[in-house]
């Protein structure tokens, strides 16, 4: 989804005014990148606003901010050294400064249509502050959702446990707020590795933050930037309803050339579209998960040259049947064909599909993380037990019960004894000499 959509940015209008409340190092970096998104909209070059909340004072220095006027930093004083991956410290820091944070929310997000709480699950500050931030916005009746990154399996056990602990708490209360957008770091890391095999490891963070920001920004542009081809439309108000739907939200995108869309033989492109839905942009879904969705929408964008030929009754009917098959129980599932009047010559043969599916259950990736935690614990226990047994066996095999033997008393030796003649009974014994 992220990537080449400059022609949208150059002429596009955003559907909703987003505010981003970034928590912790990861959450602040994502929120700042979202606030860095630019448009050519007059008097609204930077359409999003962000509040960055963190403990570690050094983390702010790592974040690039293009326009300081739409980003506010809040340093949680007294916790400048960070939370050391301890969520309890992060929660404590947020509570101590909650009044200051809420004042910033009221000032910065007063005109926002929707607020995203952004957080990298697994650390201390963001993970710890997350539940308190949810409570704060919920109690003051804000429309908000969550933008959360899931850790890779390569992360330490504590990180994985911190993440799943917070997901469990969120799942218990998810009906109280809007959509949850999950970002699978394992998926994005693989994509980064494939696209940039010679890149430095520290470039991934910048790549992933931009990828996330681009994905959300692009779908927010699609719903307000193009000319509807028919009466069926997926407008800003409908988009707002979708992201206010409790549960997990999935975004998907597919680009095809117009000659790949044969309405008389639709199996090929419908299969590709189905795969795109399941792959998603930010995390993978399974078909069974999609079938439990509450809302879905499919937007299609192409050039004026191709729109007149492609958007016939047969094609749109195929799209309706496709989305009905994939999301059979949703409340709404609009199909919205659009014409991009500003398509470049290079892209006039391209057809783009954008899907939004809301109200989904937690994905299999969360289950995979739990399985990884279980595996690590079991292997650690086995390794510790094996090492302990080896030491004990060696210890018990060692005989340290040898009794001390009393040293034998040394015999005195004064040299050879003088020969003594046996006295004859008939003669007196010879007197010994005495010196």
Swiss-Prot record:
It comes from the Bacteria. SMART domains: Tubulin. Residues 403-435 are annotated as: Disordered. The keyword Hydrolase applies. GO terms for molecular function: GTP binding; GTPase activity. GTP binds at residues 25-26, 124-126, 155, 185, 208-209. It is found in: Cytoplasm. It catalyses: GTP + H2O = GDP + phosphate + H(+). Its main location: cytoplasm. It is an enzyme of class 3 (hydrolase). Its EC number is 3.6.5.-. GO terms for cellular component: cell division site; cytoplasm. Keywords: Cytoplasm, GTP-binding, Hydrolase, Nucleotide-binding, Plasmid, Plasmid partition. One of its GO terms (biological process) is plasmid partitioning. Consists of two domains: a nucleotide-binding N-terminus that hydrolyzes GTP and a C-terminus domain necessary for polymerization. The domains are bridged by a long, central helix. The C-terminus is required for GTP hydrolysis in solution but not in crystals; it plays a role in filament assembly and in binding to TubR. Interactions between the C-terminus and the following monomer drive polymerization. A tubulin-like, filament forming GTPase; the motor component of the type III plasmid partition system which ensures correct segregation of the pBc10987 plasmid. Binds GTP and forms filaments. The filaments seed from a DNA centromere-like site (tubC)-TubR complex which extends to surround the TubZ filaments. Highly dynamic filaments grow at the plus end and depolymerize at the minus end, a process called treadmilling. TubR-tubC complexes track the depolymerizing minus end of the filament, probably pulling plasmid within the cell. This is Tubulin-like protein TubZ. It comes from Bacillus cereus (strain ATCC 10987 / NRS 248).
């Amino acid at each position: 989804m992220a990537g080449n959509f400059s022609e949208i940015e150059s002429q596009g209008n955003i559907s909703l005014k987003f505010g981003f409340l970034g928590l912790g190092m990861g959450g602040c970096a994502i929120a700042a990148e979202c606030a860095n998104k630019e448009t050519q909209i007059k008097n609204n070059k930077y359409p999003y606003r962000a509040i960055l909340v963190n403990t570690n004072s050094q983390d702010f220095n790592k974040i690039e901010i293009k326009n300081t006027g739409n980003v506010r930093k809040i340093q949680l004083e007294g916790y400048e050294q960070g939370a050391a991956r301890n969520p309890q410290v992060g929660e404590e820091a947020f509570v101590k400064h909650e009044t200051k944070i809420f004042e910033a929310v009221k000032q910065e997000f007063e005109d926002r249509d929707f607020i995203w709480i952004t957080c990298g699950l697994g650390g201390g500050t963001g993970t710890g502050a997350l539940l308190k931030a949810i409570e704060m916005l919920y109690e003051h009746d804000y429309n908000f959702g969550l933008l959360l990154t899931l850790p890779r399996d390569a992360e330490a056990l504590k990180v994985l446990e911190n993440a799943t602990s917070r997901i469990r708490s969120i799942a218990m209360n998810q009906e109280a707020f809007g959509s949850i957008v999950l970002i699978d770091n394992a998926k994005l890391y693989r994509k980064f590795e494939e696209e940039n095999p010679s890149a430095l490891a520290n470039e991934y963070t910048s790549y992933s933050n931009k990828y996330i920001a681009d994905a959300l920004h692009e779908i927010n542009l699609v719903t307000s930037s193009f000319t509807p081809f028919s009466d069926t439309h997926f407008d800003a108000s409908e988009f707002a309803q979708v992201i206010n739907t409790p549960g997990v939200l999935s975004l998907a995108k597919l680009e095809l050339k117009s000659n790949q869309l044969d309405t008389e033989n639709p199996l090929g492109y419908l299969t590709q579209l189905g795969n795109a839905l399941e792959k998603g942009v930010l995390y993978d879904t399974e078909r069974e998960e999609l079938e439990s969705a509450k809302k879905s929408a499919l937007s299609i964008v192409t050039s004026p040259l191709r729109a007149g030929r492609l958007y016939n009754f047969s094609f749109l009917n195929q799209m309706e049947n496709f989305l009905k098959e994939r999301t059979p129980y949703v409340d709404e599932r609009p199909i919205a064909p659009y014409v991009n009047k500003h398509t470049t010559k290079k892209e006039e043969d391209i057809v783009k599909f954008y899907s939004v599916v809301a109200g989904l259950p937690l994905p299999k990736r969360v289950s995979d993380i739990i399985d990884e935690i279980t595996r690590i614990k079991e292997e650690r226990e086995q390794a510790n037990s094996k090492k302990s047994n080896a030491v004990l066996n060696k210890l018990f095999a060692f005989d340290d019960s040898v009794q001390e033997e009393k040293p034998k008393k040394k015999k005195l030796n004064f040299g050879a004894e003088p020969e003594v003649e046996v006295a004859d009974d008939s003669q007196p014994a010879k007197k010994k000499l005495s010196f």
